[in-house]
């Protein structure tokens, strides 16, 4: 988006591609190493040390988002309802977002209509002297044009269909590639709130429905994503790698193609949103109605991230995931992992230890416990 603001379409393409490309290459290499050497005892021990730290990172991410998004009792209610919906009733993330938007519209029209009319007329007074772009800057390419919008959507459709036609012509298992492409396109369209928001939805579908990987492998993928540069959403690329790897009989080539396909179909809609939607956003960024809706969507995302936290915590603490907290066998608690989760939260939150440094410490902890045992 910043690249588009500064230099138009070329700037947006350059910024987007080079933001993602390094992490794609690194994660591809790490994924190949993971499936090749992951069964070695010492490598497995390394990931065992990382998993509790990853749970701690997700817990802290949830707390950080909750502090910013839960500002009224209504936001707390939406967060609680979204958690109940996805955790106890397996209601899909897109439906939760849709329901939240409907509630936000009703709330804004009937409940919040008398609240702070002055907020609509107030602006944030900020000294913008010295900034390259300010709220008063005139951006020539930011104007909305219907013809340009239609051509961008048409180009997006062509770019979306083209790889599928190649898979249809060349692959013996077209249904897998079709499923992979459709799923991650859909995931991209409902990614409100970043990687942590969409991960529960991806984990639910990829692990339980498609069975591309196990819950333990999903946590390993998150650990790899946390330790590589670039956006955390690249964890989805690891899911695509494991899907291709499993679907084609432990094929590294299919896994690599799965990773690249997942990356393509995850980020292609993002480029469409920027190039087609940015002019609209520029016109509506001060619209209080849209801000009101997005505040409730963020609150719902908090509840979804709580579900993600429990999902990963169950796998790390009990060695498996359960349908809900009521069905957990509390005699299976792995206390060493519980202790390391608590220590990790304290280290990262209280003592502000750098996340990458702590992940390295956690990996060493896993190796140490393995050699001692």
Predicted segments, located by residue:
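Multi-pass membrane proteins that catalyze or facilitate reactions on polyprenyl-/lipid-phosphate substrates
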Residues: 1-228, 235-373
């Amino acid at each position: 988006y910043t690249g588009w603001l500064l230099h138009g379409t070329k700037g947006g393409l350059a910024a987007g591609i080079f933001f993602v490309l390094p992490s794609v290459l690194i994660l591809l290499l790490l994924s190949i190493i993971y499936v090749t050497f992951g069964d070695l005892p010492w490598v497995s021990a390394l990931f065992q040390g990382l998993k509790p730290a990853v749970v701690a990172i997700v817990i802290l991410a949830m707390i950080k988002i909750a502090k910013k998004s839960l500002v009224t009792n209504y936001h707390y209610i939406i967060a609680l309802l979204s958690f109940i919906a996805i955790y106890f009733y397996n209601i899909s993330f897109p439906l939760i977002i849709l329901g939240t938007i409907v509630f936000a519209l009703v709330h804004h029209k009937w409940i919040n209509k008398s609240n702070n009319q002055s907020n609509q007329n107030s602006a944030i007074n900020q000294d913008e002297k010295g900034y390259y772009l300010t709220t008063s800057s005139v951006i020539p390419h930011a104007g909305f044009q219907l013809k340009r919008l239609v051509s961008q959507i048409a180009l997006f459709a062509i770019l979306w269909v083209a790889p599928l036609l190649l898979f249809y012509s060349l692959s013996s298992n077209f249904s897998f590639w079709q499923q992979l492409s459709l799923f991650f396109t859909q995931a991209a369209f409902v990614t409100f709130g970043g990687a942590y928001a969409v991960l529960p939805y991806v984990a639910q579908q990829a692990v339980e429905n498609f069975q591309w990987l196990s819950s333990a492998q999903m946590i390993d993928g998150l650990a790899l994503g946390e330790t590589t540069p670039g956006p955390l959403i690249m964890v989805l690329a690891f899911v695509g790698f494991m899907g291709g790897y499993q679907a084609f009989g432990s094929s590294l080539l299919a896994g690599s193609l799965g990773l690249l396909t997942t990356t393509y179909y995850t980020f292609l809609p993002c480029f469409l949103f920027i190039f087609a939607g940015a002019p609209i956003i520029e016109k509506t960024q001060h619209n209080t109605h849209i801000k009101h809706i997005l505040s409730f969507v963020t609150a719902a995302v908090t509840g979804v991230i709580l579900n993600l936290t429990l999902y990963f915590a169950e796998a790390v603490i009990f060695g498996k995931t359960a349908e809900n907290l009521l069905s957990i066998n509390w005699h299976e608690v792995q206390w060493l992992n519980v202790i390391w989760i608590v220590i990790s939260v304290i280290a990262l939150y209280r003592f502000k230890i750098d996340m990458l440094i702590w992940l390295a410490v956690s990996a060493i902890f896993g190796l140490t416990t393995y050699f001692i045992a």
